[in-house]
Every structure is written in C-alpha cells, then in structure tokens.
Curated annotation (Swiss-Prot):
Catalytic activity: (R)-4'-phosphopantetheine + ATP + H(+) = 3'-dephospho-CoA + diphosphate
Protein name in UniProt: Phosphopantetheine adenylyltransferase
Top EC class, one word: transferase
GO CC terms of this entry: cytoplasm
Family affiliation: Belongs to the bacterial CoaD family.
Function noted in UniProt: Reversibly transfers an adenylyl group from ATP to 4'-phosphopantetheine, yielding dephospho-CoA (dPCoA) and pyrophosphate.
UniProt: substrate binding residues: T9, K41, L73, R87
GO biological process per UniProt: coenzyme A biosynthetic process
Organism: Burkholderia cenocepacia (strain HI2424)
Enzyme Commission number(s) from the entry: 2.7.7.3
GO MF annotation: an example: ATP binding
Length: 165
C-alpha cells in the first residue's frame, strides 16, 4: 500500500488544490492532505477553519484523509508511513522553491520521493493569496473555490469589516 502526503497551508483550499487531490488520490492507495499550522505565514483562516474547509471539500474521497500538522514535514511523513510527498507546480516561478524543498526532503527522508504535479490548465493561475485578495476587495471568487469555501471567505471578510456579498 502506497501512502502519499500532500502538504500545504490551504488558505483557502482552491479548485486547483482539489484538482491535485482528485488526481493524486487516483494514483495512491491513501492520500493524506496535511494542513500545515504555518503560523509564520499569518494565515487568513485559523488552522481549525482550514481543517473544516478541507474536510467539507475533500470528505467525499474515500482514500483521502485530512490532518493537521505542526513542525517539520519529515515528521508528519514518517508518522503517516508515507513514501511520497506530492507537491503542486503552477508556474516556473514555483519550481525553484519546490526544487530546493525536494532536495532538502530527500536529504532528510532518503527513502521518500517527491512527486510534482501540475494543475489542470484552467487552474494553473489560481493561488490562495490571489483568491483572498479578490475576496477582500469584493470580487467574485466563485470560479476559483467551491461554494462552501466562497461562503467561508465572504463571512470572514464581512466579519473583518470588508465588503459584504
């Protein structure tokens, strides 16, 4: 049985993330979506909110587990007995950082492979940062996130005194 880990902040989880989950879950026996605490990134949504959102969007995949983690990815990979780390590459600009991380992970986890996946064409330009910015400025994010995520974004932006839907 091959277990893979797909780590990320998922702030928020986008259609691009779900696209990679759908495709990776068809390759591996188990795909663990690791929602990183990432306090240093100052996430828009709390860890608990991001876990709830991920479970709402991904809960229908029978071989996908959503879990949070803090600390080093290598420890999360080991705890889950994963043999593969799945990473998404949207553009060439992602490659340098992801290449460096893959090298470090190979050093820390010599028996674990990193697999890069590109999103489907219609999702290559989507990022959580851009989606948050559009939502905070009152724009339509419905093509980039699922309806439940759009609702979370609207409620959060409104609670922060931003545009109402």
């Amino acid at each position: 049985m091959v277990v893979a880990v797909y780590p990320g902040t998922f702030d928020p989880l986008t259609r691009g993330h779900e696209d990679l989950v759908r495709r990776a879950s068809s390759i591996f026996d188990t795909l663990v979506v690791g929602v990183a605490d990432s306090r240093a990134k100052k996430p828009f949504f709390s860890l608990e909110e991001r876990l709830t959102i991920a479970n709402e969007v991904l809960g229908h995949y029978p071989n996908v587990k959503v879990m949070s983690f803090t600390g080093l990815l290598k420890d999360f990979v080991r705890v889950n007995n994963a043999r593969v780390i799945v990473r998404g590459l949207r553009a060439v600009s992602d490659f340098e950082y992801e290449f460096q991380m893959a090298g470090m992970n190979r050093y820390l986890l010599p028996d674990v492979e990193t697999m890069f996946m590109t999103p489907s064409d219609q999702y290559q330009f989507i990022s959580g940062t851009i989606v948050r910015e559009i939502a905070q400025l009152g724009g339509d994010v419905s093509k980039f996130v699922f309806p439940s995520v759009e609702k979370w974004l609207t409620e959060k932006v409104t609670a922060m005194g931003g545009p109402a839907a």
